[in-house]
Each structure stands twice: as C-alpha cells, then as structure tokens.
Amino acid sequence: MFTRRFAASMVGTTLTAATLGLAALGFAGTASASSTDEAFLAQLQADGITPPSAARAIKDAHAVCDALDEGHSAKAVIKAVAKATGLSAKGAKTFAVDAASAYCPQYVTSS
C-alpha cells in the first residue's frame, strides 16, 4: 500500500526495470488523454516531475499498477521506477504514488 505521505511499509522483492516494462520518462502531451490521464499528468507537474513524454509517463504509470497487481512490493516498484527513469528515490516514490492514486487507488491508503 502507498500513502500520500509515503508512510507505507516498503519491504519486498527487487524488480528490474525490464520486469516492469518501464522506460525513460517523457512528457510531450497526448492528443486523446482521458481525464484520469490528465489528472495524473497534472499531479506529476504539481509534484515537480516533468517527464518529456506524456504517453511514456502514462504507460509507466500503468506498469506500476501492473506490478502491484502481480504482488510486487511498493519498495520493489519504487526501485524499478528509479532505475528506469533516473528519478531520485524520492521522485520515484512520488511517481509511484501518483500513478497508484490515479490508476489503481486500491493500493493507496488515506493515512
């Protein structure tokens, strides 16, 4: 589980970026982004993350949820995000929390 305050338990297995299917982030804007996509991208911007391609960020966000659905720990997902994107540990946590909040809120607690 993630929390908006990053107070979640971060114990688990290590994932590689290839396991998650993550690639370098990018932010260019997508022509047909859904309102969920737009909210996710806006939250990334608000959190100071500006990847060069919106499409890549959205794809990576879905990969975060896929990994969580497969039972990978939050810690492992965050490590994979950091490795794949070059974000700092804090940036990777923020990206993962924003992704989960937007696309798989069942993994986010309100604490």
UniProtKB/Swiss-Prot annotation:
Family affiliation: To M.tuberculosis Rv1271c.
Name of the molecule in the record: Uncharacterized protein Mb1323c
Organism: Mycobacterium bovis (strain ATCC BAA-935 / AF2122/97)
Taxonomy of the source species: Bacteria, Bacillati, Actinomycetota, Actinomycetes, Mycobacteriales
